[in-house]
């Protein structure tokens, strides 16, 4: 479910040494399954453990996850990274905003999942997003861009070199992607 690197475990163990005996950590998601989902880590004293929690035992600590957050923390990773600028704890939870779909789910659901969990977070940096409108009988994913992507002069490159390559790599049954958007250049456009 959650992978916690050795460096992150050592960091948590150091912090936990200053807490009440038996205190561990809790990993959670606020507003799971929504675009506003946020992940967090907090102290979890012994009296805060619920019967419905999942206990994930690691070498140096135990991480508790509440029942509601658990499916959204699938494939999550916590690391403690040190570079020239200092150290920071990172928590990556690719399924926090949308629950992972099964490998045998319909193609439309699997493509939508990749768009929402992998592609849209990248486009969001430019204020953009992409939506799956349909998959044609011929195997083309019909997409619509919004936000900063609408009217952006780089949208063709994003579509062909970024999105299409990634989707065709993950879904060989697709023939390609097409853009349905009526692009209108304006102040909202990124480039």
From Swiss-Prot:
**Could you tell me which SUPFAM superfamilies the record lists for this protein?**
Fe-S cluster assembly (FSCA) domain-like (SSF117916), HesB-like domain (SSF89360)
Which GO MF term does the entry hold, naming one?
Answer: iron ion binding
Tell me which UniProt keywords the record has, alphabetically.
4Fe-4S, Iron, Iron-sulfur, Metal-binding
Superkingdom of the source species: Bacteria
The answer to whether keyword Zinc-finger applies is no
Keyword Signal applies = no
Q: How is the cofactor bound?
A: Binds 1 [4Fe-4S] cluster per subunit. The cluster is presumably bound at the interface of two monomers.
What cofactor is needed? [4Fe-4S] cluster
Q: Which cysteine residues pair off into disulfide bonds?
A: none
Summarizing the function annotation, the protein's role is:
Involved in iron-sulfur cluster biogenesis. Binds a 4Fe-4S cluster, can transfer this cluster to apoproteins, and thereby intervenes in the maturation of Fe/S proteins. Could also act as a scaffold/chaperone for damaged Fe/S proteins.
**Family stated for the protein in its record:** Belongs to the NfuA family.
Instruction: Give the quaternary structure.
Output: Homodimer.
HAMAP family this protein is in? Fe_S_biogen_NfuA
Q: What is this protein called?
A: Fe/S biogenesis protein NfuA
Q: What species does this protein belong to? A: Salmonella arizonae (strain ATCC BAA-731 / CDC346-86 / RSK2980)
